[in-house]
């Protein structure tokens, strides 16, 4: 029996941790990819803030699927030393939170450049981050993201061919669409490395983010295929369906919305319901809180 376990970036429902917990419980989601805590980036938490956040989550029975960090969202042409120190501090935060995985990226490319010119520096810097993470007992998970080295499928494959035995792969269909890549084609190339998915769908024509199954992310097809290859996998909802407080600091471009909601909470609920509709449509049923099996 294959199982999908649901997680979410609950800061899309609210910046307040207790309200994030409420949104997760309302939607039967048992895991969180923690990105923002009461208005503070998870990467900027003090020890005390991290301990307090963990206690609230533990008391509610919510576990971290991963630390949703911004590491690697850093210009490749800048000196790496400062960012490495920032990352090392993040490893400490991750351990306090009780997580053993960190979502990260492969560095922003200069506008108009040929990413191949920066490939060696990307690989070197990722290698240093892996050294630090391995020493701390934490696994790094690379996410494809518009504007970084690993924004398109072939460069994600490049990274995985070098580090795939140590580094996980997060597959984000909408981010591939926004980088001009068809998700199903990227999936075929990256399938053997995929650790888990970010559930975010989009329209190819304008990059607009839409609920799962409503765009061109091939999410039903991909989830059906993954369910035939493994035993279990985490699906992390990252709705981006309305402009919430945290998103303003994550993306420079203005998002186009084909679906609009009165509140972030309503958008979060809609995203959860859309994923559950997709899972139901490919034969899955909820067998316990936050777990869907087939």
Labelled PLM ranges:
Residues 30-31, 63, 100, 139, ...:
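Residue-level detector of anion-binding/catalytic polar loops
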Residues 1-10, 14-30, 58, 152-167, ...:
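Histidine-acidic metal/acid-base catalytic patches
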Residues 33, 66-68, 103, 141, ...:
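Conserved beta-strand positions in the central sheet of alpha/beta enzyme cores
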Residues 9-13, 35-37, 69-72, 107-109, ...:
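Active-site beta-loop-alpha junctions enriched in small/polar residues
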Residues 38-41, 73-77, 110-115, 178-179, ...:
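A short acidic, helix-capping loop that chelates divalent metal ions and anchors anionic groups
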Residues 27, 35, 96-97, 192:
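Structural motif
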Residues 16-22, 56-59, 76-168, 178, ...:
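Active-site acidic/histidine proton-transfer and metal-coordination neighborhood
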Residues 33-57, 106-114, 207:
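Glycine-rich, proline-tolerant flexible connector loops at the mouths of alpha/beta enzymes
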């Amino acid at each position: 029996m294959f199982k999908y376990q649901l997680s979410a970036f609950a800061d899309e429902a609210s910046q307040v941790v207790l309200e994030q917990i409420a949104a997760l419980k309302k939607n039967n989601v048992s895991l969180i990819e923690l990105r923002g805590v009461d208005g503070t980036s998870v990467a900027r938490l003090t020890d005390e803030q991290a301990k307090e956040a963990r206690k609230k989550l533990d008391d509610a029975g919510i576990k971290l699927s991963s630390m949703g960090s911004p590491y690697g969202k850093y210009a490749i042409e800048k000196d790496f030393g400062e960012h490495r120190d920032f990352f090392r501090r993040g490893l400490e935060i991750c351990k306090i939170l009780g997580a053993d995985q960190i979502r990260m990226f492969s560095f922003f490319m200069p506008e108009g450049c040929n990413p191949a010119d920066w490939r060696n520096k990307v690989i070197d810097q990722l290698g240093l981050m892996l050294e630090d993470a391995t020493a701390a007992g934490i696994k790094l998970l690379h996410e494809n993201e518009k504007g970084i080295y690993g924004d398109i499928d072939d460069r994600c494959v490049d990274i995985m061919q070098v580090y795939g035995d140590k580094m996980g792969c997060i597959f984000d269909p909408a981010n591939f669409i926004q980088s001009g890549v068809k998700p199903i084609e990227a999936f075929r190339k990256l399938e053997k490395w995929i650790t888990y998915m970010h559930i975010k769908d989009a329209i190819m024509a304008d990059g607009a983010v839409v609920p799962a199954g409503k765009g061109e992310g091939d999410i039903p097809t991909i989830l059906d295929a993954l369910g035939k290859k493994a035993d279990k996998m985490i699906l992390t909802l990252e709705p981006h369906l309305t402009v919430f407080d945290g998103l303003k600091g994550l993306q420079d471009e203005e998002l186009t919305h084909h679906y609009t909601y009165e509140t972030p909470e309503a958008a979060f609920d809609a995203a959860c319901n859309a994923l559950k509709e997709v899972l139901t449509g490919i034969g899955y049923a909820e067998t316990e809180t936050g777990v869907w099996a087939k």
